[in-house]
């Protein structure tokens, strides 16, 4: 199996043929997928490091995933930032850093709400030739239901449930869910 994406070669050929728009669209699609995959790989490496109780290493992977997303302005598309925030929250709880965990919980819930509320931003120049539609974005109600389920059922969040901040964030999620029904 080749260690490169054949679409990159096709894009180069399209460019040489003078089909610039087609080449640009294909190159942007490849870039988007590579960035997304790199972010997901960093998150996976962070999960492994977290399971091995190598929390500093996990945070470095998660920070790199966020930096990648920030660099390419991909967060408007719902990329990995919420996954990173969720993982950081879990690690902070395991480390007994309750105040930092509650702060991360706020960040996590606001990230989900931004996605669900569909806050529009300008399309990043890296992806301005790509078309976005409902099939390329996750179902909004499902995201909130999933987050609420995780917060209410995962053992790692148990010690946060008695906190006011936790209850406020759960209420925000529930209110947004009611609006979406």
Predicted regions and their residues:
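Alpha-helical protein-protein interaction modules
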Residues: 35, 39-181
């Amino acid at each position: 199996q080749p260690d490169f994406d054949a679409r990159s070669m096709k894009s180069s050929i399209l460019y040489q043929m003078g089909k610039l728009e087609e080449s640009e669209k294909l190159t942007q699609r490849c870039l988007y997928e590579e960035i997304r995959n790199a972010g997901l790989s960093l998150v996976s490496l962070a999960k492994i490091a977290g399971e091995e109780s190598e929390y500093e290493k996990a945070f470095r992977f998660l920070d790199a995933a966020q930096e990648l997303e920030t660099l390419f302005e991909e967060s408007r598309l719902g990329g990995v930032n919420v996954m990173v925030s969720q993982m950081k929250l879990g690690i902070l709880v395991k480390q007994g850093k309750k105040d930092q965990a509650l702060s991360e919980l706020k960040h996590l819930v606001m990230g989900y709400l931004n996605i669900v509320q569909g806050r529009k931003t300008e399309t990043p120049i890296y992806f301005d030739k790509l078309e976005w539609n409902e099939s390329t974005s996750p179902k909004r109600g499902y995201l909130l239901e999933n987050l609420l389920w995780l917060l209410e059922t995962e053992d790692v969040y148990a010690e946060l449930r008695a906190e006011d901040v936790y209850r406020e964030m759960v209420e925000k999620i529930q209110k947004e869910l009611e609006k979406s029904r």
